[in-house]
Each structure stands twice: as C-alpha cells, then as structure tokens.
Amino acid sequence: MPELRQDPTTKQWVIIATERAKRPEDFVQQSISLTLPPYKVDCPFCPGNEQMTPPEKMAYRSGGPVNGPGWWVRAVPNKFSALIPEGSLIRKEEDGFFRKMDGVGQHEVIIESPQHNLCIPLMEDKQVEEVVLAYRERYLTLREDPRFSLIIIFKNHGPRAGTSLEHPHSQLVAAPIVPLSIRYRYEKAMGHYDDAGTCVYCDYIRAGLRVRTRLIMETERFLAFHPFASRAPFETWILPKEHEASFGSITVDDSKEFSRVLKAILLKMYRALNNPDYNYIIHTAPIKDEQEEYYHWHLQILPRLVTPAGFELGTGMFINTALPEETAAFIRDFPV
C-alpha cells in the first residue's frame, strides 16, 4: 500500500508510491559515451583562461600571479550574476500594489579544480578539502557585509540539474532577503523548539542513530542518511552531529572531515548510479540567526533521477517511487 510520510523538519508530506516502487538498481543511469578532456582551450574556468572571468575574489595557488595560472581552487564573480553588489536596498512600490527593489547581492563561482574533467567523487581527498575550505572562507567573508541576510552555497552537476558549463564548479549567492521557502523551513524548526525544547534536526539525528535503517555513513562528527520522507530517490542529507545553526560555525578540522563524508557519498552515487545528475545545497541559518538553538545546518543532495510533473507542480507534494530504507541499504553496501 502507498504511504504518506511527513518530514518532521518541515511538516510537508511526501507520497511513497510503493505500488509503483522500483528497485534501487532500476535507477542506474544509462551510460553516456561522453569523454571530457582534462583541458579545453575555450573553457573560461580552465587555467590560462583567467582573463575570461571577472577578477578573482580568492584563490588557493602554489605560485603564479593573481588572476593567472597556478591555482587549484578559485572563486570569481559569476559573469552572468543573478545579483550584483551595487544598488539600493530601499523597497519601492509600483502601481500602488507591487513591491520591488534593486537586485543587490553577490553571486560567485567556486571553480573546484583546474582540471576540466575532474568531478568531486574522483578528486583526491586533499582537493575536496580545499573546495570545502573555499566555501567556508567565502561564507565567513561575505557574512560580514551588513547588506546580506542569507548565504546559500550549491552545486549543479549535469544538464538535468541545470549546469551550463562542464568544468567542475559550485556557486554561492549572498542575498539581502530570506526567501519565503527558507523562512518557512526556519519557522517550522522554531515551532518544534518552542513545543519540545529541542532542535528538530538534533532529534532527527538521535532517531536515525536508533533506527539506522536509513543511515549510510557515520563518522565522529558527521552523519549521512536518506530522509524518512525523501522527496526523490536517493535523496541524502549530511549533518554535523553537534548542534550548529550556521555553516559559518564549521571549523577547519570539521571542514576536512565533512569533505571526506561528502566525497564518500558522491563516490558511492557515482559508482552505483553511473554518475547521475544531481544538485546539492547547504542549508544554513540566516546570518542574523546564526546562534539560535532551533536550526541546524546540513547539506542536501538531490539526484535528478526522475522529473517532477503536474501533480508535484500543482501541490508542492512529491511522489517518491523508491523506499528510502532500500535505497540507503543499496548505497551503504555498494563497494567502491
């Protein structure tokens, strides 16, 4: 029988369509005969083409000039930014009803490797550490700008996930507002704290450690699992075990451990599902609420194995055709 499952962190319902459920191995992607070169002469993110991007905001390099070769991780403004640093934060009305403001913010690209064809699962551990440390450095820098209310770090991998350039990269957006969907998620966590006196994500971790059927990986400080009410097959969360509302609280040592968990999970997915398209997002508290007790930063991975259709678009409720307990076991036990 199909199940309706409720996400304890958002109170949103998901349909687990067991009547049309697929086996985990049915989600393995068909092989695509596309071999990428380690370098492309016309790629703006490849070394030697630094003049094709705006001036860098930061880079980890072993030598060479600023905005030149020699780097292994590099952050630059997005050439086609959704938001720009200049402008006014004053909100204006139009036609006495509509509200608008200048698109002020910061939109950056974190170029994860000088190698054009090297994705995170195939990187050396040290390289993935440097990527996460770059996330941390840019977050800590941008949160000092009083104009910004929220910083979101995300990655689009593959065309179904919305990527437009093959070269491995992530993105960061610092915005002057907190979008309604994030405010909703935050308010639900606040409501749980008011009712129970605990962080709902900390409670989720404790429940996951008791049951363990959806657990994929556990280290000293981090946990990875498939959520009870997964929106899509193989959806994965990575959370710090200790309560931290903001990604900005992550230490250098924790960044390194987190990077190893992230790489391990993505490598399992790469091998088990044949390099699927996916998005990942680091969910974190708004800047002014970074010390609150009711939110808990985490990374969410959403593989793009199915396409949302009219029901999902019309209701906001997702239909998942895979049991999280089965997908977790499949990934957990898959040899890499």
Identify the residue ranges that each predicted region occupies.
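HIT superfamily nucleotide-processing domains
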Residues: 1-336
